[in-house]
């Protein structure tokens, strides 16, 4: 990933987080945290990794809500950032938090068994 795409990714992360938490009025989108944004080298696609507070049902509902709100989020980004072309957004669930929690539970169980 180039330096420019990394910088754009970091700025997108900040802006998308702010838009979701302050501007987005979709009731299907619950407590969402943007954990990472990866932008392609040509800045045409941004993979937005999010975590959602809640169970599988809330996670699916929030991801669907984000997909439906993609146009609004892109228009807000266009107003906030000086980009010739706003990247297409692809929302993905970040499973690294769940994986970390699973490892932590396994370690705690091992320590308890000693």
UniProtKB/Swiss-Prot annotation:
GO cellular component: cytosol
Cystine bridges: none
Keywords for this protein: Cytoplasm, Ribosome biogenesis
Pfam families in alphabetical order: RBFA
Subcellular location(s) per record: Cytoplasm
The keyword Cytoplasm is assigned to this record: yes
This protein's record includes keyword rRNA processing: no
Superkingdom, natural source: Bacteria
Record GO terms (molecular function): ribosomal small subunit binding
GO biological process, one term: maturation of SSU-rRNA
Sequence similarity: Belongs to the RbfA family.
Function (record text): One of several proteins that assist in the late maturation steps of the functional core of the 30S ribosomal subunit. Associates with free 30S ribosomal subunits (but not with 30S subunits that are part of 70S ribosomes or polysomes). Required for efficient processing of 16S rRNA. May interact with the 5'-terminal helix region of 16S rRNA.
Subunit structure comment from the entry: Monomer. Binds 30S ribosomal subunits, but not 50S ribosomal subunits or 70S ribosomes.
Name of the protein this chain belongs to: Ribosome-binding factor A
């Amino acid at each position: 990933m180039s330096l420019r795409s990394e910088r754009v990714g970091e700025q997108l992360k900040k802006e998308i987080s702010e838009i979701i938490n302050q501007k987005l009025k979709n009731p299907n989108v619950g407590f969402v945290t943007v954990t990472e944004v990866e932008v392609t080298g040509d800045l045409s696609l941004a993979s937005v990794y999010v975590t959602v507070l809640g169970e599988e049902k809330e996670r699916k509902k929030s991801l669907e809500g984000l997909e439906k709100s993609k146009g609004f989020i892109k228009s807000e980004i266009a107003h906030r950032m000086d980009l010739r072309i706003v990247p297409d957004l692809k929302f993905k669930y970040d499973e690294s938090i769940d994986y970390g929690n699973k490892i932590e539970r396994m370690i705690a169980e091992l320590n308890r068994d000693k």
